């Protein structure tokens, strides 16, 4: 890996994308195709939830240092085989750490039992998962990572818990987080981004919603769900009412993690590329909007959970290396912001 193209710690230079992979769209889309480069062997475990549902967790157990455990919360429609999960778990294994990817409800390949699914602000689910992991691993140091909406849930939970989160997690990293859900959804619902991204996610979200409409006899018009082509339409029809929100705007406003950043009490890295197609730079927080425990890092490029590095065809080592370095380093200063020009 070319060190000029990857930032291994806060104190050194920012991430730079390879010359052969320009632009946020290419950096986002291309990274998905590199998942097969990382071989990971998981052990699946099923947990029953307090509300009589279930979630599946995929564990990486073969580690020399069982005292450190990374918990990775995946992004929208993600799972343990997503490119960022495989690359991070492979790198964690190299470091001798254990890892686990809890699947949000319905994301492990099997539909969950209840009407409810998962949503961008489901910090209660994060709370239950992390507390149970800590209870089952009382002698392990827990490090949490959230990707995209998994990062939004994690940051919201960290803010809600404040300093008490330190009883459960040592440190946290949120990557490519849609910190302002209103801004993110608005960004993705128009133009080329609607075609590239909203359509991609809705391709799987719509069938899942339709299955729940039938299974639970919901008073929702299936034709309207099939016809939804934006996040606003889909969240207005399904996500918001199913999870107790008035509409999409109410859901996005109440679930955004950005207002919680100034309440976080454990060392947390917020890493967002400035060319992330999912969030405009105007929605990124400033240093005075976050607590002293939060480090903001906004490299000029990287796309949405891209951060490819090296010569063609590239590698995904940069992001997991950055995450693990943050987890193992001593912060030299508080509330540090790094923005590349």
Where are these regions (language model features)?
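Alpha/beta-hydrolase-fold enzymes
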Residues: 2-7, 135-242
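Conserved alpha/beta-hydrolase
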Residues: 81, 89-113
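Short beta-strand/loop motif that positions the catalytic acidic residue
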Residues: 264, 270-272, 276
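Short beta-strand element of the alpha/beta-hydrolase
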Residues: 67-75
């Amino acid at each position: 890996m070319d060190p000029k193209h990857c930032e291994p710690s806060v104190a050194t230079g920012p991430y730079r994308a390879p010359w052969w992979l320009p632009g946020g769209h290419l950096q986002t889309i291309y990274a998905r195709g590199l998942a097969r480069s990382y071989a990971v062997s998981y052990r699946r475990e099923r947990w029953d939830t307090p509300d009589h549902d279930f979630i599946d967790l995929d564990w990486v157990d073969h580690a020399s240092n069982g005292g450190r455990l990374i918990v990775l919360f995946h992004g929208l429609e993600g799972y343990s085989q997503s490119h960022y999960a495989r690359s991070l778990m492979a790198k964690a294994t190299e470091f001798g750490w254990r890892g686990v990817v809890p699947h949000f409800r319905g994301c492990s390949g099997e539909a969950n039992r209840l009407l409810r699914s998962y949503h961008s602000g489901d910090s209660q689910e994060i709370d239950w998962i992390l507390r149970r992991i800590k209870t089952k691993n009382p002698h392990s140091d827990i490090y949490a990572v959230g990707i995209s909406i998994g990062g939004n849930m994690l940051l919201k939970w960290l803010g809600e818990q404040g300093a008490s989160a330190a009883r459960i997690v040592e440190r946290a990293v949120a990557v490519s987080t849609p910190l302002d859900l209103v801004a993110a959804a608005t960004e993705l619902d128009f133009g080329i981004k609607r075609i590239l991204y909203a359509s991609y996610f809705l391709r799987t979200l719509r069938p899942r919603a339709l299955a729940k409409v039938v299974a639970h006899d919901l008073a929702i018009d299936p034709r309207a769900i099939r016809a939804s082509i934006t996040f606003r339409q889909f969240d207005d029809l399904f996500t918001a009412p199913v999870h107790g929100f008035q509409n999409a705007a109410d859901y996005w406003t109440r679930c955004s993690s950005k207002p919680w950043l100034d309440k976080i009490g454990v060392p947390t890295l917020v890493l967002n590329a400035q060319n992330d197609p999912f969030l405009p730079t105007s929605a990124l927080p400033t240093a005075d909007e976050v607590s002293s425990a939060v480090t903001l890092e906004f490299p000029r490029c990287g796309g949405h959970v891209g951060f490819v590095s090296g010569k063609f065809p590239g590698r995904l080592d940069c992001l997991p290396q950055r995450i693990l370095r943050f987890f193992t380093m001593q912060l030299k200063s508080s509330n540090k912001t790094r923005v590349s020009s």
